[in-house]
């Protein structure tokens, strides 16, 4: 039908090697880098805060080096349509707040009083109390860029060429599982907290 609404073209595409490096860094970031950092920093007597900081700092540096051209291309697109991008950011933020309220209600129904104890959030809060500076740099600057390039650009961008629905589902589940899998190893019930990350991974 001529009046059927058409989605805007998807232009945020990495090159073949940019995709390989972004997705390929996932197992490095999740498993190999933490193990290497723990061995090195424990030998040096460093704290858990600096262990986490070093893992994200290495990933952040790797992503900037390997994805710089992709970031530069997309920054040009943002500048060309700044007003439209700003409207999308604000509307998405408002939608995320609404979705978060709904998710919080679902968690209360499922877990009752235990719904406030997301172990990942507790861990970040505790690290912030112990060492605010490194944790703030990690959470505000390094983690968003690193995670967006792996999950949004890498996984979503790759699958988007074949199926928009599959791209959303896989990238959302991967992003959500990424935040709770370590805690679920100790208690599988912690997998329920994946739903807290679905709104932000969708938007």
Spans of model-derived segments:
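Generic structural signal of hydrophobic/aromatic residues within well-ordered alpha-helices
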Residues: 71, 106, 123-127, 137
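Short acidic/polar alpha-helix capping motifs at helix-coil junctions
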Residues: 25-27, 117-123, 170-177
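Hydrophobic alpha-helical segments of integral membrane proteins
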Residues: 82, 86, 106, 120-124, ...
